[in-house]
């Protein structure tokens, strides 16, 4: 069994395009945009995992990014950006946490990372 990295890449590209378009149109709030960006990042990471025949045993973005760093030349700065994304997730916490407000600066950083990861992933597609 393996991951069909081409399908994962294609889905990531669709989410990426949607995130960029929604940001330009201003049709959704930052929290919704954040989730679409995370879906895109998840798909790009899954595509990279498939390229190196790796099936993640955990679905967390940070876990997958860290494992990719062991299996390929994966930029350390991407791991930091994935951690930044995860910093806004509160739904897995056992304690009640007030959701963090996602600012325009945060969204710009997330979109920049998403585009960098997209380009990185596409450059490795054979």
Region locations from a protein language model:
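Terminal alpha-helical segments
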Residues: 1-126
């Amino acid at each position: 069994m393996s991951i069909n990295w081409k399908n994962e890449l294609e889905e990531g590209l669709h989410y990426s395009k949607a995130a960029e378009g929604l940001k330009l149109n201003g049709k959704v709030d930052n929290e919704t945009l954040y989730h679409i960006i995370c879906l895109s990042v998840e798909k790009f990471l899954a595509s990279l995992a498939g390229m190196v025949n790796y099936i993640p045993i955990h679905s967390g973005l940070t876990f997958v990014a860290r494992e990719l760093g062991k299996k390929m030349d994966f930029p350390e700065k991407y791991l930091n950006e994935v951690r930044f994304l995860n910093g806004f997730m509160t739904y897995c916490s056992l304690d009640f946490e007030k959701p963090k407000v996602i600012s325009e600066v945060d969204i710009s950083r997330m979109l920049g990372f998403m585009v960098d990861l997209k380009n990185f992933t596409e450059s490795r597609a054979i």
